[in-house]
């Protein structure tokens, strides 16, 4: 949008401004891997990178915004990007990780899901939706944890929490 306004008024961005325009588009769409990517923005980013001699491949990697789980506690991991929802009187929470590679199933199951089960009790939640975006393979793992069990879903692309995942979760509570 900012770039479009600059074009409309005839303003030519500096190299630093062009870089910031590209970064803002990439960060918002997980380096154009997200389902909410607008293909015209990809073309604009490539054009600007070429025009201003910016390293497009470096920017793609930089803008993945990977979660530094090696420096985080389990509590920080399971609450990263946490949001709360009220779906028809049911309390639901979600959190996510953006990782280059998904950790082993033993870490996910024995450490993270175990901690999520405790978090459900502690916060009196109906459900905790834990999302892992695996950037290396362009996959999304959705883990729905309730007091009654765990349901896991795997998707062959990077989904949007707000656009793709949570609206489906909301429908679970609408019925």
Identify the meaning behind each predicted range.
Residues 42-175:
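C-terminal accessory domains and tails appended to enzymatic cores
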Residues 1-44, 163-166, 170:
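Short alpha-helices
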